[in-house]
């Protein structure tokens, strides 16, 4: 990376539709952001296509290669922070078990190996949640294993697990303040 370029935000999207549009709003408020879109996230993006406006200069990396080639950018110190949001219970479980078989889980693994701090917004975090589905609001009941995996992930090095949109907003604001920029 050229010395004149500032490190960027990395933001990984998973297949969760829960808080998806709110996360897009947060992404639009950042400068210097790259999106990592897993295959499952690409399906969700298609549903929200009309709301998928990004800030100027944002780059999008899609899950198109077996080796998830864009993860090499973490070794080049291109990123100061990774945000994994919204994170499905499947993504959280894979992160906890060290499985990096898609773009989102791979960038999380590489961020950890490169000591890039991560903020993870785990969506399945309460015994009962309400979420918006194509047919309207539905109640979701995360399994005990989902709640346990979220707890386990919160013990990972350089990983800040947030449990609500307000906590995600606060974690991003804190990180921005620490970095002194966007």
Listing of model-derived features with the role each one plays in the protein:
Residues 1-182:
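A cross-family phosphate/adenosyl-ligand binding-site feature
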